[in-house]
Structure formats: structure tokens, C-alpha cells
């Protein structure tokens, strides 16, 4: 898997910010002082947090100059020393966390750890930005930052500029790495939705059961409402009340007897002889093979 862009950007900006802050802390170049009355015109003093250097065009730079104005005892210098060292230590901790979070030897990055390193870098940038801004605010104030009287000129030197750049790089790199919290939070929310509830879910609305008194009914209404006026079902009704299971089968059509012989054959002869009397009707044999009416 490719490293996300926010992690790559953060891992590029934060080491650069650490390097610039380190140079700004150690180099004697926070303030430039020139224009001394009792010194040559080309004499320049570079004041830092730990040392003061003297530079002249005809000579090389000489460091370790004595502090004639109690410059190192001023409050902005003392605070800047402590905060810049704290910023360097915090940045080193952030690099350690970022190395573990931005997987250099794993397939998947640890988004939570990378986001935490971004927060640490952001705090480190604030630790370095506060003393740099405070020092720059009182740069030309002799009551806060000790300096010789006029016509001495006080200017910003290179270490202060490097401190500004290093702080901004740490802030940007920390913010970029802190964006790694977005996929981490999304994954956590997805797991919380899929996880089953730990216990039985309680309803937010409680159900209240109220036993209302039954209304008093007249004897006639109670008699008819209870069904007492209905006679008990008979056996015939019980049989018909049973449910019939299944589906109706088709019934075959009724069968009828068909005679292939003509049943009216011989009826004319029987009609002619019927006048002879009833006795002769019963004694004559029937010429039809079918049963005759006299046989019935």
C-alpha cells in the first residue's frame, strides 16, 4: 500500500523544521547591534541565546564576547532558552512516533499513532513560535532587552528568521500528520456499528399499565353479552361446525342406462289385444325380449 500524501508531506516538513530550529537555538544571531560610538564603524555584534560574537571587516568573527549590558539575564532570553529546548525535545518525540506510525516496514500504516505524532509536532511548533515572536516584539526595547543607548542600531538577525521558518514548518507538518486521524476515526465508527450491544437494550419509553374499573352492566345486557341466551349446539350443528380440510374433488357426471333396442316395438299389438280382457293379457306370451308391462 502506498503511503498517504498527508503522511509523506508531514514526514518531509517536520525534519526540516527540526533542523532550522536547532540552528536557530545554537547560532548567535538573534539580534544584530551596530553603530557604537567608541568602536570602529564596521564593528558588528551578533547576540544569540548562548553567545555574543564580534565581527569586523578587517578581522574574523570572534565569539565569547563579554556581556556588558546583562543581556543574558533578561526575561525574553531566559524564556526563549527554555522553550526552544523544549521544542527540540518535543520534535524528537514526534519523529519517533511518526516513524512508528508511518509504516516503514509494514504494509498498513498505523493511523492513530501517525495522527498523535502530528499533534506532538504542532505543539512543538507552538513552543518555538512563542519565544521567537516575543523576542521580536521587544527587539528594540532597551528596557526589556538590554542594549546600549543611541545612536546604536538594533536589527533582526538570521537566527530569528530561521526560528520563524522552523516553527511554521513544524506547524504545517504537524497539521498534515494530524489528518491521519480521519481514517482512524472512520474505522473506529465502523467497528462500533458492527459490534453487538453489550447488554439488553432498554427502551427509552416506559410502558405503564392501568387497571381501569369495569363498568357496571344491567342484568339484561350482561345476559345477552355473555351469550347465555343462545341454546347449546346440537350434534348436527357440531358436525357441520367442523372445518373441512382439503379442496373439493370434481364429481363424475351421473350415469344413465341406454337401451339399444326399440322399446316401443310390439306396443301396437299389445294395444290391439288389450280389448280382449284382462285374463287373456296375462296369459299371452310377450314377443319382445324386453320385459312387458304385463309382467310388471
Swiss-Prot record:
Q: Which GO terms describe its biological process?
A: calcium-independent cell-cell adhesion via plasma membrane cell-adhesion molecules
**Comp. bias (Low complexity):** 273-284
Q: Does the keyword Kinase apply?
A: no
Which GO CC terms are listed, alphabetically? bicellular tight junction; plasma membrane
The record's subcellular location field reads: Cell junction, Tight junction; Cell membrane
Q: Where is the composition biased (Polar residues)?
A: 285-296
Q: Note the superkingdom of the native organism.
A: Eukaryota
Topological domain ranges for the Extracellular compartment: 24-81, 133-160
Q: Name one GO molecular function term.
A: identical protein binding
What this chain does, per the entry, is described as: Plays a major role in tight junction-specific obliteration of the intercellular space, through calcium-independent cell-adhesion activity.
* Entry protein name: Claudin-23
Report the gene name.
Answer: Cldn23
Amino acid at each position: 500500500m502506498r503511503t498517504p500524501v498527508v503522511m509523506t508531506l508531514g514526514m518531509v516538513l517536520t525534519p526540516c523544521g527540526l533542523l532550522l530550529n536547532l540552528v536557530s537555538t545554537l547560532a548567535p544571531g538573534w539580534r544584530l547591534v551596530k553603530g557604537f560610538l567608541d568602536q570602529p564603524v564596521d564593528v558588528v555584534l551578533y547576540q544569540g541565546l548562548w553567545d555574543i560574537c564580534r565581527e569586523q571587516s578587517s578581522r574574523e568573527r570572534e565569539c565569547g564576547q563579554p556581556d556588558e549590558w546583562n543581556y543574558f539575564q533578561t526575561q525574553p532570553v531566559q524564556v526563549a532558552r527554555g522553550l526552544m529546548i523544549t521544542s527540540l525535545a518535543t520534535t524528537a518525540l514526534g519523529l519517533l512516533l511518526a516513524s512508528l506510525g508511518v509504516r516503514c516496514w509494514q504494509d498498513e500504516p498505523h493511523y492513530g499513532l501517525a495522527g498523535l505524532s502530528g499533534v506532538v509536532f504542532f505543539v512543538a511548533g507552538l513552543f518555538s513560535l512563542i519565544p521567537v515572536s516575543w523576542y521580536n516584539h521587544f527587539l528594540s526595547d532597551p528596557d526589556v532587552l538590554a542594549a546600549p543607548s543611541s545612536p546604536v542600531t538594533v536589527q533582526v538577525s538570521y537566527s530569528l528568521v530561521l526560528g520563524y521558518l522552523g516553527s511554521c514548518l513544524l506547524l504545517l507538518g504537524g497539521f498534515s500528520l494530524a489528518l491521519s486521524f480521519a481514517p482512524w476515526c472512520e474505522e473506529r465508527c465502523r467497528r462500533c456499528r458492527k459490534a453487538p450491544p453489550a447488554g439488553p437494550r432498554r427502551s427509552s419509553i416506559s410502558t405503564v399499565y392501568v387497571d381501569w374499573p369495569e363498568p357496571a352492566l344491567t342484568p339484561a345486557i350482561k345476559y345477552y353479552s355473555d351469550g347465555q341466551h343462545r341454546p347449546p349446539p346440537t350434534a348436527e350443528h357440531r358436525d357441520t361446525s367442523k372445518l373441512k380440510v382439503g379442496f373439493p374433488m370434481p364429481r363424475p357426471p351421473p350415469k344413465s342406462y341406454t337401451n339399444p333396442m326399440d322399446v316401443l316395438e310390439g306396443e301396437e299389438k299389445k294395444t290391439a289385444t288389450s280389448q280382449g280382457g284382462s285374463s287373456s293379457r296375462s296369459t299371452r306370451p310377450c314377443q319382445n325380449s324386453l320385459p312387458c308391462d304385463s309382467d310388471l
